[in-house]
């Protein structure tokens, strides 16, 4: 059975809660205990977990943004069965719907100026450009196309390969 706990804030708040002032005690940090300090009445935090998955937006527009903090958290939260596994939506969750048409052949190579993201303008850009906006209206085919497009985009960013055949070749 899977249970989801929503932390309800951003990655930099997590950093401050878990790591700030605890740099010398990183081997003994108890994530669930830190979460209980914020939300002591939530019974899910008393459960035992086989895996902990942390999903946050990158949020470079936050005034607490720091590449060093991101690197520290990625290093620390690197295994779901130990300290937890951190996944970061880049630049934020809204990126999944940044399709100007559907399907959108340019999606894989679409870039946004990082300075605009840091200024908090990305959501506005997606709001103006996105062809798909309401997640509750998505069909299975639309979800599949979004997933395939994002796999292709990740493959293009990391390996400069544009097709799924290339992805399969990497893993064979």
Predicted feature residues:
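N-terminal carbohydrate-binding/catalytic regions of secreted carbohydrate-active enzymes
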Residues: 28
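A surface-exposed, charged beta-strand/loop segment in the N-terminal or early-internal portion
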Residues: 31
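C-terminal accessory helical subdomains adjacent to catalytic cores in phosphodiester-
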Residues: 2-5, 12-17, 22, 34-172
């Amino acid at each position: 059975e899977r249970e989801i706990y929503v932390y309800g804030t951003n990655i930099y708040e997590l950093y401050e809660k878990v790591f700030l002032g605890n740099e010398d005690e990183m081997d003994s940090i108890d994530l669930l205990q830190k979460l209980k300090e914020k939300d002591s009445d939530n019974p899910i935090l008393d459960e035992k977990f086989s895996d902990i998955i942390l999903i946050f937006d990158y949020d470079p527009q936050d005034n607490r943004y720091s590449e060093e903090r991101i690197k520290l958290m990625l290093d620390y939260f690197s295994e779901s069965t130990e300290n937890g596994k951190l996944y970061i939506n880049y630049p934020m969750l809204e990126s999944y719907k940044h399709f100007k048409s559907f399907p959108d052949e340019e999606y894989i190579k679409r870039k946004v100026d990082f300075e605009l993201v840091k200024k908090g303008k990305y959501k506005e850009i997606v709001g103006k450009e996105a062809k798909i906006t309401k997640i509750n209206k998505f069909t299975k085919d639309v979800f599949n196309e979004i997933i395939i497009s994002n796999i292709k985009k990740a493959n293009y960013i990391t390996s400069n390969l544009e097709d799924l055949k290339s992805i399969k070749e990497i893993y064979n």
